[in-house]
From Swiss-Prot:
Gene name of this polypeptide: ERD14
Tissue: In stems, cauline leaves, roots and flowers. Low levels found in maturing seeds. Absent in dry seeds.
Any one GO MF annotation of this record: lipid binding
Organism, as annotated: Arabidopsis thaliana
Protein function: Intrinsically disordered protein acting as a chaperone. Prevents heat-induced aggregation and/or inactivation of various substrates. Binds to acidic phospholipid vesicles without affecting membrane fluidity.
Protein name as annotated: Dehydrin ERD14
Biased amino acid composition, Basic and acidic residues: 1-13, 25-45, 52-78, 103-134
Keyword tags: Acetylation, Chaperone, Phosphoprotein, Repeat, Stress response
């Protein structure tokens, strides 16, 4: 009995000789799923295909009912392919088209600006380099300038730097006495 219990598989699988070399087999990996697939033809497919060559109609063929949709009606009514002034309506009766009256368009004359070169466009954007316009269009009544009103005490204009200095802690602006001394010098 000891001889029967040896590592013998229950079913012996006969080895099939393959046409591939042993190098190809080792390159495919452990499960051999990347190998070349052989063209297999299933014998089951041919009889099945021959059975279904004829189509069987179980129900009676229904006569085709033509349903007109709203879109089709609109498309047909808008078509202007016919040269006649009559057109079939949705009822099947002929009706005359209304003639479209075109309103006369009023043409507005647009003044074309003078074609300007690159330098003229740049000069126009810069201050002080404006081209003098027509003198006749600008001739207007002289503007009356009211005399400037003098204030009791003149307001000092502060620069940006002075405004920033005032906001700094510990900054004490000059008194009026110190400013008068500088003005005298």
């Amino acid at each position: 009995m000891a001889e029967e219990i040896k590592n013998v598989p229950e079913q012996e699988v006969p080895k099939v000789a393959t046409e591939e070399s042993s190098a190809e087999v080792t390159d495919r990996g452990l499960f051999d799923f990347l190998g070349k697939k052989k063209d297999e033809t299933k014998p089951e497919e041919t009889p099945i295909a021959s059975e279904f060559e004829q189509k069987v109609h179980i129900s009676e063929p229904e006569p085709e009912v033509k349903h007109e949709s709203l879109l089709e009606k609109l498309h047909r009514s808008d078509s202007s392919s016919s040269s006649s002034s009559e057109e079939e309506g949705s009822d099947g009766e002929k009706r005359k088209k209304k003639k479209e009256k075109k309103k006369p368009t009023t043409e507005v004359e647009v003044k074309e600006e003078e074609k300007k070169g690159f330098m003229e466009k740049l000069k126009e954007k810069l201050p002080g380099h404006k081209k003098p316009e027509d003198g006749s269009a600008v001739a207007a009544a002289p503007v009356v300038v009211p005399p400037p009103v003098e204030e009791a005490h003149p307001v000092e204009k502060k620069g940006i730097l002075e405004k920033i200095k005032e906001k700094l802690p510990g900054y004490h602006p000059k008194t009026t006495v110190e400013e008068e001394k500088k003005d005298k010098e």
